[in-house]
């Protein structure tokens, strides 16, 4: 991933860190929803520009959009790694001669059909990845919205009884404190097929040449 937030999805990377126990955050739907909205706007903007072969102000606006995502991630997570990304973006925006910008598309690159298709595959996959990550959050929100005292009590009683009989039961109480645990459970059901599913969805949307697909796979998909 480039310093200014190239694909893969930053929302997905955040949730992946939580799933892999690299981050321990308090569940906050408002932050996660806003990150999703900003990042989807970023992906939509880049994909539209690549399709139209339009590079006018492309790089500057792209970096500005990703800067908004990074600032919100820093505010939510307090992770100073995001501050480094923010500083890198700000430097790029103020530098007259930026070195190796992460998403600097030129007209020459976009005139080549294969290169353009690879960019579309990359960013469309990132957008689909962002949508999938948000779908996990939405499932958790539905669970949390259905909570009431009676429901929780019944679930708790049922769990205590079944735990006594079957000690191996993997149970997660439905409550805000366990929101990310619920999300992880949902992801575990998808783990073995989600990457392949997102790849197929991306290829169906972009409809690239076989050459572009082969090169895309060789670059590695996160």
UniProtKB/Swiss-Prot annotation:
The keyword Lipoprotein applies. The keyword Lipoprotein applies. Keywords: Lipoprotein, Myristate. A lipid is attached at residue 2 (N-myristoyl glycine). Belongs to the mimivirus R683/R861 family. This is Uncharacterized protein L683. It comes from Acanthamoeba polyphaga mimivirus (APMV).
């Amino acid at each position: 991933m480039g310093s200014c937030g190239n694909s893969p999805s930053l929302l997905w990377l955040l949730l992946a860190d939580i799933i892999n126990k690299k981050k321990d955050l308090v569940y906050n739907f408002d932050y996660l929803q806003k990150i999703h909205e900003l990042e989807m706007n970023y992906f939509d903007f880049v994909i539209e520009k690549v399709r139209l072969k339009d590079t006018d102000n492309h790089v500057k606006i792209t970096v500005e959009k990703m800067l908004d995502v990074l600032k919100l991630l820093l505010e939510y997570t307090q992770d100073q790694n995001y501050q480094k990304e923010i500083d890198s973006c700000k430097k790029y925006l103020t530098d007259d001669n930026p070195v190796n910008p992460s998403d600097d598309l030129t007209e020459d690159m976009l005139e080549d059909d294969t290169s353009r298709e690879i960019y579309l595959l990359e960013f469309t996959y990132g957008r689909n990845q962002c949508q999938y990550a948000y779908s996990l959050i939405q499932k958790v929100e539905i669970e949390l919205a259905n909570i009431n005292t009676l429901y929780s009590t019944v679930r708790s009683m049922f769990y205590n009884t079944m735990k006594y009989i079957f000690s191996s039961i993997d149970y997660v109480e439905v409550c805000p404190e366990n929101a990310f645990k619920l999300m992880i459970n949902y992801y575990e059901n998808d783990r073995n097929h989600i990457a392949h599913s997102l790849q197929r969805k991306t290829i169906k949307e972009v409809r690239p040449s076989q050459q572009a697909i082969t090169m895309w796979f060789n670059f590695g998909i996160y």
